[in-house]
């Protein structure tokens, strides 16, 4: 199948680029995309609970007082749950929220997302995407040339100038093919992909 190729300098169509039907023309599997996106979001969660039981609390090694003779109740440690400064009886622990996503599921979800982006004309293929200096206004100007505002730019490799130019924008981001994820793909209104990145995507998802 063919996708329109846009010349970044002019913002006009400059021909077409052949892409894999299996990757950019696959059927949309909503359930699979939902599962993979949720798995990525769950994996980003960090545990916030952390309490100690009686064995984890510092101290309490010495017997507080003699077993007999004082008239007080028997005590073997000062770090039991009923003591001030003691450990919790049933402490909360950090939970691992991560979910397993195997390669077949990941590739299937990515193909479904890219195919849906292509069908809805939210996937923009450009000849190249570079800035001469790390300036946000230069990056925004290039997006304006494409009549885009909310966009993720995918390049062949890490470009420091592009990264620095886009990091202060809440409505735009830059990543390379190696670091793309389904959450970013569904989170932006438009996805800009360079011609070189298309070939890398086809190799990665084949």
UniProtKB/Swiss-Prot annotation:
Tell me, what is an example of a GO biological process annotation in this record?
Answer: translation
**Native species:** Hydrogenovibrio crunogenus (strain DSM 25203 / XCL-2)
Q: What is this protein called?
A: Large ribosomal subunit protein uL4
One term of GO molecular function: structural constituent of ribosome
Q: Which SUPFAM superfamilies does the record associate with it?
A: Ribosomal protein L4
Disulphide connectivity of cysteines: none
User: Would you name any one GO CC term?
Assistant: ribonucleoprotein complex
Q: Which InterPro entries match?
A: Ribosomal_uL4 (IPR002136), Ribosomal_uL4-like (IPR013005), Ribosomal_uL4_dom_sf (IPR023574)
Q: Which Pfam families match?
A: Ribosomal_L4 (PF00573)
Q: Where is this region: Disordered?
A: 47-79
| Protein task | One of the primary rRNA binding proteins, this protein initially binds near the 5'-end of the 23S rRNA. It is important during the early stages of 50S assembly. It makes multiple contacts with different domains of the 23S rRNA in the assembled 50S subunit and ribosome.
Could you list this entry's UniProt keywords, alphabetically sorted.
Ribonucleoprotein, Ribosomal protein, RNA-binding, rRNA-binding
Q: Which Gene3D superfamilies match?
A: 3.40.1370.10
Q: How does it assemble?
A: Part of the 50S ribosomal subunit.
Composition bias (Low complexity) maps to: 69-79
């Amino acid at each position: 199948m063919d996708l329109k190729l846009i010349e970044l300098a002019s913002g006009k169509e400059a021909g077409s680029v052949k892409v894999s039907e299996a990757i950019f023309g696959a059927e949309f599997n909503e359930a699979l995309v939902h599962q993979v996106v949720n798995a990525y979001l769950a994996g980003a969660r960090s545990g916030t609970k952390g309490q100690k039981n009686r064995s984890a609390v510092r101290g309490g090694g010495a017997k507080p007082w003699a077993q007999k003779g004082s008239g007080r109740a028997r005590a073997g440690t000062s770090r039991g749950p009923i003591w001030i400064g003691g450990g919790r009886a049933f402490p909360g622990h950090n939970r691992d929220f991560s979910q397993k996503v195997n390669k077949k599921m990941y590739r299937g979800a990515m193909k479904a997302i890219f195919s849906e982006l292509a069908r809805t004309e939210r996937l923009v293929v450009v000849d190249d995407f570079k800035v001469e200096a790390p300036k946000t206004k230069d990056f925004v100007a290039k997006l304006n040339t494409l009549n885009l505002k909310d966009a993720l730019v995918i390049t062949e490799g890490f470009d420091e100038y592009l990264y620095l130019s886009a990091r202060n924008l809440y409505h735009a981001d830059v990543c390379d093919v190696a670091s793309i994820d389904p959450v970013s793909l569904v989170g932006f209104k438009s996805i800009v992909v360079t011609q070189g990145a298309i070939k890398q995507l086809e190799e990665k998802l084949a």
